[in-house]
Amino acid sequence: MVAPTFNLPGWVNWIAQDADGAWWGYSAEPHQHDRGWYENEVGDCVLLGREAPAPRWRETLQSIQH
């Protein structure tokens, strides 16, 4: 899956879309829960934007190459 183009903060190393269509950026690899992703205990996150919900949202996790 190809993610939309976002203006990412420099600290964002991972992006993923939740089941509701929200795209999030994470500083550390996030964990998956039943309807989306959440930051691990050492990371930060930021809401990047929203799109139509993706049926295959579990496949949206991507590392960002800086």
What is each residue range found by the language model?
Residues 40-66:
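Low-complexity intrinsically disordered segments
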